[in-house]
């Protein structure tokens, strides 16, 4: 809990300094993390499985008190947990079932779309498009290269089984602790190929800078939403107050930090909510990013017909596919993919993902959050109506910049 409080303090200070200061922190953290990843990849590229096994045995015993033979014992524990996913091969059907896992991970690089409005040149849709596309393509390529390097030195078999053994115990499916009691962090495992504790520490510290650069983004996007809601009169005007020098929305930050402390406490100590440990309740949280995109996709499909004047005045209007608006064609394709993903995640007919309707508490929690948002809006609408303000007109159409 102390670490959480310190991180919240760090994030609050950095964001309170303003966008320019946070951008510098993020840029520095990004490149330090990249340097750490590059070193990890070099050790995986030039290392060997024999060196990794020897390093694992030595470090797991010294650092985590593991018994001798941790490599073989970890594979056995993972197999007992049911880890059978290969790195290569598989039928087309199996590949499609793997997509929801991959997209669940890849939703996060695209999550930056919520902040693209604050990027210089955001009014040029081509910059937004290229920014999102490059982020996804680069992330995917790095993941592929990294998996290949992991398979070369650590082996995919060990990595997969180590995770299965760890999470099988972590989520309470077995009472027997895994041979490797620490989470099998790939960077940590890669650095086991060196016997230098100083080098291990420096590289892992460098990799951790990604977290410091990313952590502020969670509050940055959320505080901007809270600020916008106050600016549009859904929340009290005081919430839109900004600090004169940094122009940071101070009260919006407070509305994030205080609930953040409460949620962190519930998560760290896994307090029961809806009869289930809070950690399990959060499993469906990433899913709502896809739900948000689905709503935007439907709006994009209908835009050329529902808001024809607005559409024809936009740069995207000149792009057609077989005479049809490109935005609608792309929207139908992407929308169908999102519906497939949401079906697999929520219905989960093959019991693969653990975040759907079978995880009743998690889905209920997400539903309560949506319901809370509706209640806040309806209450605000009633209050503002009494003040002579029609919120319906405020949200009917976004004004042109």
Q: Positions of the model-derived regions?
A:
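Membrane-interface loop-to-helix entry segments
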Residues: 2-68, 107, 131-138, 286-294, ...
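C-terminal membrane-solvent junction of multi-pass transporters and transport-like membrane proteins
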Residues: 11, 25-28, 32, 242-247, ...
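Hydrophobic, small-residue-rich membrane helices and short re-entrant helix-turn-helix hairpins
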Residues: 17-27, 107-146, 223-245
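Hydrophobic alpha-helical segments and their helix-loop junctions in multi-pass secondary transporters
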Residues: 34-81, 147-157, 293-310, 340-347
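TM-loop-TM module centered on a large, flexible mid-protein loop between adjacent transmembrane helices
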Residues: 68, 74-82, 131-215, 235-282
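Membrane-helix boundary/coupling elements in multi-pass transport proteins
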Residues: 101, 106-115, 194-237, 293-300
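Alpha-helical transmembrane segments and their membrane-interface junctions
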Residues: 256-271, 335-355
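Short, highly charged, low-complexity non-transmembrane loops/tails of multi-pass membrane proteins
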Residues: 314-319, 386-401
């Amino acid at each position: 809990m102390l670490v959480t409080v310190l991180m919240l303090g760090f994030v609050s200070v950095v964001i309170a300094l303003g966008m320019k200061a946070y951008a510098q922190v993020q840029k520095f953290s990004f490149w330090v993390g990249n340097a750490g990843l590059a070193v990890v990849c070099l050790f995986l590229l030039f290392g060997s499985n024999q060196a990794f096994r020897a390093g694992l045995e030595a470090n797991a015993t010294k650092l985590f008190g593991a018994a001798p033979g941790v490599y073989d014992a970890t594979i056995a524990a993972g197999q007992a947990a049911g880890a059978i996913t290969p790195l290569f091969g598989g039928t087309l059907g199996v590949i499609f079932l793997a997509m929801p896992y991959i997209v669940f991970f890849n939703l996060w690089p695209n999550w930056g779309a919520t902040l693209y409005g604050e990027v210089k040149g955001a009014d040029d849709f081509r910059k937004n498009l290229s920014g999102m596309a490059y982020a996804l393509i680069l992330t995917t390529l790095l993941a592929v290269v990294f998996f290949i390097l992991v398979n070369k030195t650590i082996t995919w078999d060990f990595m997969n089984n180590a995770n299965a053994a760890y999470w099988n115990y972590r989520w309470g499916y077995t009472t027997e602790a895994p041979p490797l009691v620490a989470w099998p962090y790939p960077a940590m495992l890669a650095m086991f190929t060196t016997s230098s504790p100083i080098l291990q520490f420096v590289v892992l510290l460098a990799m951790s800078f990604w977290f410091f650069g990313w952590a502020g983004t969670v509050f940055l996007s959320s505080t901007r939403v809270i600020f916008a809601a106050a600016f549009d009169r859904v929340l009290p005007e005081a919430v839109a107050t900004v600090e004169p020098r940094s122009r940071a929305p101070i009260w919006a930050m407070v509305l994030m930090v205080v609930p953040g402390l409460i949620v962190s406490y519930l998560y760290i100590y896994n307090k029961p909510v809806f009869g289930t440990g809070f950690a399990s309740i959060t499993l469906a949280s990433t899913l709502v990013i896809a739900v948000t995109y689905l709503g935007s996709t439907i709006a994009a499909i209908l835009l050329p017909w529902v808001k024809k004047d607005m559409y024809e005045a936009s740069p995207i209007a000149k792009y057609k596919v077989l005479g049809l608006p490109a935005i609608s064609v792309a929207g139908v394709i992407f929308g169908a993919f999102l519906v497939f993903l949401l079906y697999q995640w929520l219905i989960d007919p093959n019991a693969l993902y653990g975040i759907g309707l079978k995880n009743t508490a998690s889905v209920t929690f997400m539903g309560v959050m949506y319901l809370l948002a509706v209640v806040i809006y309806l209450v605000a609408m009633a209050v503002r109506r009494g003040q002579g303000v029609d919120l319906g007109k405020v949200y009917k159409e976004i004004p042109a910049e």
